[in-house]
C-alpha cells in the first residue's frame, strides 16, 4: 500500500488509480470509491491472509490452515469453471465462522454500537459473502468518515490497520486464555 498511500497523500488521484490497478488489481470507478475499495482490500487481505488462517490453525491444526489457504488460492486462480465454482462454494463454508468471529472482534475493539447496528440482521445470514461482512464490519468499527484526498484519506488506512492490530491482540489473548484453561 506504500505507493498508493504516497500518491493519495500528495493528492495525485491519477497516480493513485494507476497504483491501485497495478499493485492491488482494483478497478475503481470514481475518486471517492477508490479509497473505499483500498480500505476494503486492506480488510479483506488481512482477513484471508492472517485471520482465517490463524482461526483454522488454532481450531483444527496446521492441515486445516493449509487446506483453507489452498482452497482460497484455488477459488482465485482455477482455470476450470467447475473447479472454481466448487472451490468458491467450499470457501464460503470455510469463511462463514471466522468472518463472524472477526466481525465480533471488530465490535469489541472498535465502535460496538455501529457494528451491531450495521450487521445485526446479517451476522448469522448464510447468504452474505465473507468479504462483504468483513469490510462492512471493519468500516463500521473504525468509524470511517467520508473519503477525502490527502492526509485525512491516508489516516483512514492507518485507522483500519490499527483496528486490525487490536483485533489480532484480542485473538491472541483469547487463545492464551484458552490454552491456560485447557
Residue ranges and their predicted role:
Residues 1-182:
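Hydrophobic N-terminal alpha-helices or hydrophobic patches in metabolic proteins across all domains
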Amino acid at each position: 500500500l506504500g505507493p498508493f498511500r504516497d500518491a493519495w497523500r500528495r493528492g495525485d488521484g491519477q497516480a493513485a488509480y494507476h497504483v491501485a490497478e497495478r499493485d492491488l488489481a482494483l478497478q475503481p470507478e470514481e475518486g471517492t470509491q477508490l479509497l473505499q475499495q483500498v480500505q476494503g482490500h486492506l480488510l479483506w487481505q488481512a482477513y484471508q491472509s492472517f485471520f482465517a488462517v490463524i482461526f483454522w490453525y488454532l481450531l483444527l491444526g496446521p492441515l486445516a490452515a493449509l487446506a483453507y489457504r489452498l482452497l482460497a488460492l484455488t477459488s482465485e486462480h482455477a482455470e476450470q469453471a467447475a473447479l472454481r465454482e466448487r472451490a468458491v462454494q467450499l470457501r464460503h463454508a470455510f469463511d462463514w465462522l471466522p468472518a463472524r468471529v472477526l466481525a465480533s472482534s471488530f465490535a469489541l475493539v472498535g465502535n460496538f454500537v455501529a457494528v451491531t447496528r450495521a450487521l445485526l440482521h446479517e451476522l448469522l445470514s448464510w447468504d452474505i459473502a465473507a468479504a462483504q461482512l468483513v469490510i462492512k464490519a471493519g468500516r463500521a468499527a473504525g468509524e470511517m468518515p467520508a473519503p477525502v484526498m490527502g492526509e485525512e484519506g491516508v489516516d483512514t488506512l492507518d485507522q483500519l490497520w490499527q483496528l486490525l492490530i487490536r483485533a489480532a491482540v484480542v485473538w491472541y489473548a483469547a487463545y492464551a486464555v484458552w490454552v491456560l484453561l485447557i
